[in-house]
């Protein structure tokens, strides 16, 4: 870890929504707050949440596949370190008995939470979810680097985001 260990997560046993991402970015590592960057700003818009709601651990759990910033590679941040999730993920998720909705961001989180669909493209997973919504929602990473994907898939904003906001509101209202 180029910047040293600084595990970042947010979790309360009463959380209704789990956000399963990749790993903290450089800005989040520096601030000590998950999604404290442009990706977090975009994600909060997607979910229809204010910053205070998003960072309320009694509502939202944020548990990335890698808890620490992994460093930067040729095309952005490196993937989460491979030893992290196998060591702690399952016991940590067991502490979230009230999770009603899991939002899965990025390829590594998708492989963990939707292992039977690891070979499917994100577009295929999202179209399947639109056809038959489940409590596990695959999402693109909200990074500004994914702008090209968003432009190639305008149906994401038109169809997925309204339903996503509805599901988020329902999960939080059940509290």
Question: At which residue positions do the language-model features occur?
Answer:
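Generic C-terminal helix-cap and adjacent flexible tail
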Residues: 166-175
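A polyanion-binding, active-site-adjacent surface
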Residues: 1-167
């Amino acid at each position: 870890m180029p910047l040293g260990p600084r595990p970042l997560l947010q979790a309360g046993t009463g959380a209704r929504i789990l956000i399963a991402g990749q790993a903290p970015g450089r800005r989040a590592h520096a601030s000590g707050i998950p999604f404290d960057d442009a990706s977090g700003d975009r994600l909060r818009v997607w979910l229809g949440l204010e910053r205070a709601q998003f960072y309320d651990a009694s509502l939202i759990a944020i548990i990335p596949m890698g808890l620490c910033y992994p460093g930067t590679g040729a095309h952005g941040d490196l993937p989460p370190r491979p030893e992290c999730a196998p060591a702690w993920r399952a016991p940590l998720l067991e502490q979230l008995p009230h999770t009603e909705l899991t939002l899965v961001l990025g390829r590594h989180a998708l492989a963990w939470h939707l292992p039977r669909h690891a070979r499917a493209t994100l577009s295929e997973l999202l179209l399947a979810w639109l056809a038959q919504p489940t409590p596990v929602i695959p999402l693109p990473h909200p990074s500004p680097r994914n702008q090209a994907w968003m432009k190639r898939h305008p149906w994401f904003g038109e169809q997925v985001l309204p339903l996503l906001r509805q599901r988020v509101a329902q999960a939080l209202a059940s509290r």
